[in-house]
């Protein structure tokens, strides 16, 4: 299991995957907007998206678990 963590505080701008999607390592999973920048969060491993724990518009903190990918 690989958790995708927020890198900095911000607002979820978009989610580009759904639970059950197959993803490759390095694939964009979601984008967080912080200080007028968009920060893409990428899959750390290839596998299946098991959880997406946030919704568009949600405020997140650095270190929050935003998604989970299983190999």
Where are the language model's segments positioned?
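Generic recognition of well-ordered secondary-structure surfaces with a strong bias
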Residues: 6, 41, 54, 59-60
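Short, well-structured beta-strand-loop connectors
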Residues: 19-29, 56-66
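Short alpha-helical linear motifs
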Residues: 50-51, 67-70
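Short beta-strand-turn/beta-hairpin segments enriched in glycine/proline and small hydrophobics
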Residues: 1-11, 31-44, 71
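Short histidine-centered loop motifs in beta-beta connectors
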Residues: 7-8, 14-18, 51-54
């Amino acid at each position: 299991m690989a958790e995708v963590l927020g890198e900095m505080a911000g607002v979820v701008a978009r989610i580009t995957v759904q639970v059950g999607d197959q993803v490759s390592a390095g694939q964009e999973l979601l984008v967080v907007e912080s200080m007028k920048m968009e920060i893409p969060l990428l899959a750390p491993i290839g596998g299946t998206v098991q959880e997406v724990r946030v919704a568009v518009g949600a405020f997140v903190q650095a270190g929050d678990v935003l998604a989970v990918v299983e190999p």
